[in-house]
């Protein structure tokens, strides 16, 4: 619920392009679309893991089946200097039916990235510096500051993210860490009942890298406490 507006219980990043006559969240999305996206050339939507999530720093490089735009967006993503780049093509192509802030930018022909740095509501020096570094690189790429961007020398590209889903209610405990490389079938966590008894073990549905872990123990059946990234085949 950390991402929901208290007035209408909606997530801003799921209400684009918005509605000026809608709920408070829908009105805010419409304002961003009208006043920012219509006037910008590039967008970076900066996220973190908030208070409940641990994550491997990464950047989403969306694509909308427009060769020129998709290529420019990917070049922008690499220029940030972030090592882990997730290719993301599961958002709408129609600007009238977009979903998120970056998706709305993309449907208007403008590169829109999402970065994920930091976790558990912390603002320690390493996370702050990483965010400043990607910001400087982006400004170099856009010729808004003198200098050249420094792409990561060994970028890791992911084709898809896959959720690990709990079949039961309970308390989740991970058995792997962020950045762990796992094989399909590896036990990545367990769900216990309120008396501490193991109800089920959760396994990875794929070979991949652990990208996100929810650190708050309660989990409901059908929810995902962990996300695995599938690396692009070279």
Enumerate the language-model features and the residues they cover:
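Structured catalytic-domain cores with a bias toward divalent-metal coordination
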Residues: 1-234
């Amino acid at each position: 619920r950390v991402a929901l507006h208290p007035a209408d219980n909606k997530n801003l990043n799921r209400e684009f392009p918005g509605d000026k006559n809608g709920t408070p969240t829908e009105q805010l999305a419409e304002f961003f679309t009208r006043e920012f996206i219509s006037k910008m050339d590039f967008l970076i939507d900066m996220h973190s893991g908030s208070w409940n999530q641990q994550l491997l720093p990464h950047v989403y490089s969306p694509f909308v089946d427009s060769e020129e735009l998709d290529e420019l967006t990917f070049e922008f993503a690499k220029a940030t200097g972030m090592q882990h780049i997730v290719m993301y093509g599961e958002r709408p192509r129609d600007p009238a039916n977009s979903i998120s802030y970056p998706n709305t930018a993309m449907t208007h022909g403008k590169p829109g990235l999402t970065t994920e740095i930091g976790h558990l509501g912390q603002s320690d020096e390493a996370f702050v510096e990483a965010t400043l570094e990607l910001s400087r690189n982006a400004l170099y790429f856009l010729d808004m500051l003198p200098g050249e961007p420094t792409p990561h020398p060994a970028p890791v590209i992911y084709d898809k993210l896959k959720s690990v889903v709990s079949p039961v209610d309970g308390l989740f405990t991970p058995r792997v860490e962020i950045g762990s490389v796992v094989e399909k079938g590896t036990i990545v966590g367990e769900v216990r009942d309120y008396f501490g008894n193991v109800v089920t073990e959760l396994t990875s549905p794929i070979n991949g890298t652990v990208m996100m872990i929810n650190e708050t123990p309660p989990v409901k059946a059908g929810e995902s406490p962990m996300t695995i990234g599938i690396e692009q085949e070279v």
